[in-house]
Curated annotation (Swiss-Prot):
The keyword Cell division applies. GO terms for biological process: carbohydrate metabolic process; cell division; cell wall organization; peptidoglycan biosynthetic process; peptidoglycan turnover; regulation of cell shape. Substrate binds at D60, R68, R133, K163, H164. It comes from Xanthomonas oryzae pv. oryzae (strain MAFF 311018). This is Beta-hexosaminidase. Pathway: Cell wall biogenesis; peptidoglycan recycling. The record marks D174 as: Important for catalytic activity. Plays a role in peptidoglycan recycling by cleaving the terminal beta-1,4-linked N-acetylglucosamine (GlcNAc) from peptide-linked peptidoglycan fragments, giving rise to free GlcNAc, anhydro-N-acetylmuramic acid and anhydro-N-acetylmuramic acid-linked peptides. NCBIfam families: PRK05337.1. It is an enzyme of class 3 (hydrolase). GO terms for cellular component: cytoplasm. The active site is at H176, D247. It is found in: Cytoplasm.
Length: 334
């Protein structure tokens, strides 16, 4: 199955045709797709109307610098702000993270979007792409926040996606623009980077997004192209039974599998349920690549939201004062 990107704030005729394809599981929305809150509601409805089956609509609404919907939405704190508070006030920090998850999920669902790919459970150890998206550099602290965040997302009716498996936070390279390799053995990863993923899976996380990072002491290919990582470790050893997403095949670190078709097949062959094709110019070739493949069409049904909440009153029960420990404006709508 493919999650595709679309070009703008309205669907084109070609994009409506793409949504008719059996392999299209849904759409990933970006800043380019956002004009206003009401426009996102209309776009989400148009996507569902164009598809002959239930589809998944997703976004990255993590908070901080990775927040695709801004005007009319709460300005959410980066996850690192909660980790920074934890040493002095752990219970308040966890309460803030739970409120952050509930508020984010409620606003996203009220816009007709099923899920935000969240939470980031990578360790905050200097990666250029992760940065303040991570809760902490301490595996146990990240694990504690992961449990709280997953539970809060579920309480707001949103599925939880752990990313980026098996851990993107320690390598320095940004896989959007460069290849990345982590030389540590599996035992070191199990003692550190995998700890939050174990916690998230135990908390009932619904999905995992793979990293485009190579761990050569474990497998020779990037994790998202690796049966060893997906089938043997994530599913076999760690017991994960949910949906496995690739990261975007338009990222530079994905190019090791060759062209567009090669990347799509490599992810599916490795055990990914869903391949992210975020760049519209790659969609047609990706659809051609999956012609004739057996696809896991049932995998995503559990991720589709439980029905959008109305925007009026969506904050009921949410203590917005906990959306950030540092700045009150993060808890109010912009």
């Amino acid at each position: 199955m493919l999650l595709i990107g679309v070009a703008g704030t309205e669907l084109s005729a070609q994009e409506r045709d793409w949504l008719q394809h059996d392999a299209v599981a849904g759409v990933v929305l970006f800043k380019r797709n956002f004009g206003s809150r009401s426009q996102v509601v209309e776009l989400s409805a148009a996507i569902r109307a164009a598809a002959p089956r239930p589809v998944l609509i997703c976004v990255d609404q993590e908070g901080g610098r990775v927040q695709r919907f801004r005007e009319g939405f709460s300005a959410l704190a980066p996850l690192q702000s909660f980790g920074a508070q934890y040493a002095q006030a752990p219970e308040a920090a966890l309460a803030a993270a739970r409120a952050h998850a509930q508020l984010m999920a409620s606003e996203v669902r009220a816009s007709g979007v099923d899920l935000s790919f969240a939470p980031v459970v990578d360790l905050g150890r200097g990666n250029r792409a992760i940065g303040d998206r991570a809760f902490s550099d301490d595996p146990q602290i990240v694990a504690t926040f992961t449990r709280a965040y997953v539970q809060a997302l579920h309480g707001a009716g949103m599925a939880a996606t752990l990313k980026h498996f098996p851990g993107h936070g320690t390598v320095l390279e940004d896989t959007h623009v460069d290849h990345a390799s982590d030389p540590r053995p599996l035992e070191a990863l199990q003692a550190e980077d995998l700890v939050p993923f174990v916690a998230g899976i135990e908390a009932g996380a619904d999905a995992v997004m793979m990293a485009h990072v190579v761990y050569p002491q474990v497998a020779p290919e990037p994790a998202g192209y690796s049966q060893r990582w997906i089938e043997q470790i994530l599913r076999g050893q760690m017991g994960f039974r949910g949906v496995v997403f690739s990261d975007d095949i338009g990222m530079a670190a994905s190019f090791s599998a060759g062209g567009v078709a090669g990347r799509v097949h490599a992810h599916l062959d490795a055990g990914c349920d869903v391949v992210l094709v975020c760049h519209p110019e790659l969609v047609a070739e990706s659809l051609q690549a999956v012609q004739g493949r057996r696809l896991n069409t049932a995998a995503l049904i559990g991720l589709i939201g439980r029905g959008a909440l109305g925007w009026d009153g969506l904050l009921a029960g949410t203590d917005v004062s906990f959306t950030t420990p540092h700045s009150a404006h993060f808890g109010t709508t912009a």
